[in-house]
Regions:
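Radical SAM enzyme [4Fe-4S]-AdoMet core and its adjacent flexible, acidic
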Residues: 37-60, 64-177, 187-193
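Conserved SAM/AdoMet-binding glycine-rich loop
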Residues: 1-36
């Protein structure tokens, strides 16, 4: 059986698409970077206007329609929001339970690129998140943060950690144009086009 995950920026999400996603997709990734100012800076429309106010209510509705399961909100932190624990907590305060905010991947020359000297600040943010997760445990504001989800009982996640990310064994990225890549990180790189 194939499992399908859809990643969406939410712009074209409507009731019909939501119904399809809930019926056909095993998982859905809702791409939002956290606080309004952070999201709008990195995800503007062509006219320069931010997309946060348009996509947030759609994402809240979709997460609820999936009973806060089988989805996650996925953001990216950059040099411009090294205080990304605030973005994670913003999303949790909005009611999202499944959250992943990950470091940007890109050229070191980009003005938003993270550098080695940023690591102490980044590590401190992870410490803040860990403490806040403990504080919120068993409250109505608790949440799962993807990077802290460890399987200490030896379940199926152990095999995944040993075999890697799944690229080439159980994972395939499909672009809107039907191009196939072994991983979403390789999309657009001609040498990885399958």
């Amino acid at each position: 059986r194939f499992r399908f995950t859809l990643t969406t920026n939410g712009v074209l999400l409507n009731d019909e698409v939501q119904e399809f996603v809930n019926r056909e997709m095993d998982n859905v990734v809702l791409s939002i970077d956290g606080r309004k100012e952070v999201h709008d800076r990195m995800r503007p429309f062509r006219n320069g206007k931010g997309s946060y106010d348009l996509v947030l209510p759609k994402f809240e509705k979709l997460a609820e329609s999936r009973n806060q399961e089988k989805y996650y909100v996925r953001g990216t932190f950059t040099k411009n929001n090294k205080d990304f624990s605030n973005d994670v907590l913003h999303l949790a305060d909005l009611g999202f339970k499944q959250i992943s905010v990950e470091p940007v991947v890109g050229s070191d020359e980009e003005d938003y690129a993270l550098q080695a000297e940023d690591l102490p600040e980044i590590f401190a943010e992870y410490d803040k998140l860990a403490a806040e997760m403990v504080n919120r445990y068993h409250t109505d504001k608790d949440f799962n943060f993807f990077h802290f989800m460890l399987d200490l009982t030896g379940g199926p996640c152990v095999a995944k950690r040993l075999s890697g990310c799944g690229s080439g064994t159980e994972y395939l990225a499909v672009t809107p144009w039907g191009d196939l890549y072994p991983c979403h990180q390789f999309v657009g790189e001609e040498k990885y086009l399958m």
